[in-house]
């Protein structure tokens, strides 16, 4: 959490399950606000018990600002069934904590089903669709619940598929995602977008996109690697969020052409 704050973050989205009490202790102490997320969007007895336990456990936390009811539930999120489930969950949350809003993180079906029930609508990666949605539903708060997802290897600047290396520049991402600069340019120019949560702050075990095969066993999405060492996007976010000036220029192996582009992050306009 200290590393994220140094980068310029002021909010943490738990995904896709409740965070540990120790993490929330750190957020309470360090001043990081949190969107607290239950494990699954469902209204069966077990799911409702999990939701209730989450709210009861964390409702007195000063860091918690909203309750997320689910993430990318494609089978139900745009349906009447999904809306009924979300209403049931929202009623339970409101009964236990009437002071905080509810949210869901969706990657499609904006304007249908669940999106009509929750107080805050989270957009996963569909940042370009937020302007049109706001024009249709101007009273609903919206934010980027997952944004970015540039893939990068710390300290490397030439792609090498044989070694499972992607360059650390803010250039490569899966088809559904965007660069840091692309999503932030949209959000920064539209005050009705309440910021965004990048995927992800740190690399993590699993989802080794773009290679998805051995020996890659960890993700490339983080602004920091799994040990907390900054990658290049860290300095971009730090420049735009903490106003600390420029970050260090990238350095790396020379490309086959004999030259390596140099990038730097800056808060100057």
Go through each PLM region and give its residues.
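Extended substrate-binding grooves/exosites of carbohydrate-active enzymes
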Residues: 1-269
